């Protein structure tokens, strides 16, 4: 299974190349999909397009989640309303015309889709190799499963970490500034309000890691509360069961379009360069 982080793949190119033309963005997205499908289909099988749905459950749990992104987009010189319109349009075109399952669900991010599908391969009788196509280091935690690998399109190399479990624990303690999640020594509003976070020492994290089974006893009440906050937001095993079930059910029940749709679609959208290599869109 190839799990492609749709928004991350698309936005990384759009931001770098300052794209806002519908045809150029469509071509860029389709060409990326073609390239990764060709590269990994024979070893990893079917590709799954994993997309961000609206109204993520993390925002309900933690209102500050990714709050800075909206502010940063407002200050950007790119037309984000138009960019998201195109991303949504192309995602639906892929669902209707390309031979891939597209998982796009209300309340779920691509992280949830990738996490749930990767974890599902640990169930009896469902083991298969998994390749995650994303530069997001949040997925390092999934490397604890021997069948899961990750390729970074931005760095153009495999993402590797010697100890995924330790990485995940440190990530929880340190928080994630890009997602508006403070470290566990700092209050909920630290990043959104520009409040300086309380410094986090390596020694403190190591002490907590050595006593991970007794955190409630060795942390202050506030530290433990913030640890639980960050664990819920960062640890993919914390995805609510209802969302995990929705993702798995959608994946298992969704039908994919016939191969013949691909060529007709590329002709209709005048993707002339891609027409020449249409077979590279087919599953392995």
Regions found by a protein language model. Give the residues of each.
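A general marker of short, structured functional hotspots
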Residues: 32, 36, 57-61, 76, ...
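Intrinsically disordered, low-complexity N-terminal regions enriched in serine/proline/glycine
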Residues: 35, 39, 64, 150, ...
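Accessory alpha-helical DNA-binding modules that contact the DNA backbone or grooves
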Residues: 173-247, 259-284
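Acidic, Ser/Thr-rich, low-complexity intrinsically disordered regions in fungal proteins
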Residues: 254-257
């Amino acid at each position: 299974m190839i799990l492609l982080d749709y928004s991350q793949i698309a936005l990384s190119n759009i931001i770098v190349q300052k794209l806002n033309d519908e045809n150029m963005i469509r071509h860029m997205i389709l060409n990326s999909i073609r390239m990764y499908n060709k590269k990994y289909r024979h070893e990893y099988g079917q590709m799954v397009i994993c997309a961000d749905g609206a109204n993520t459950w993390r925002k309900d749990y933690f209102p500050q989640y990714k709050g800075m992104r909206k502010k940063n987009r407002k200050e950007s010189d790119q037309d984000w309303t138009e960019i998201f319109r195109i991303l949504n349009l192309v995602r639906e075109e892929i669902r209707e015309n390309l031979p891939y399952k597209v998982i796009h669900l209300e309340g779920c991010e691509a992280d949830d889709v990738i996490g749930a599908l990767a974890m599902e391969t640990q169930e009896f009788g469902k083991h298969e190799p998994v390749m995650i196509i994303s530069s997001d280091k949040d997925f390092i935690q999934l490397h604890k499963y021997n069948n899961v690998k990750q390729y970074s399109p931005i760095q153009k190399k495999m993402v590797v970490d010697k100890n995924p479990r330790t990485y995940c624990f440190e990530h929880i303690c340190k928080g994630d500034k890009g997602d508006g999640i403070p470290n566990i020594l700092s209050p909920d509003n630290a990043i959104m309000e520009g409040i300086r976070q309380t410094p986090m020492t390596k020694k403190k994290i190591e002490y907590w890691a050595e006593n991970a089974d007794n955190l409630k006893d060795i942390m202050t009440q506030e530290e433990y509360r913030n640890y639980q906050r960050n664990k819920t937001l960062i640890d993919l095993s914390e995805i609510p069961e209802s969302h995990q079930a929705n993702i798995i059910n959608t994946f298992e029940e969704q039908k994919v379009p016939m191969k013949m749709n691909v060529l007709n679609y590329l002709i209709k959208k005048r993707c002339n360069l891609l027409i020449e290599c249409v077979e590279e869109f087919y599953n392995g």
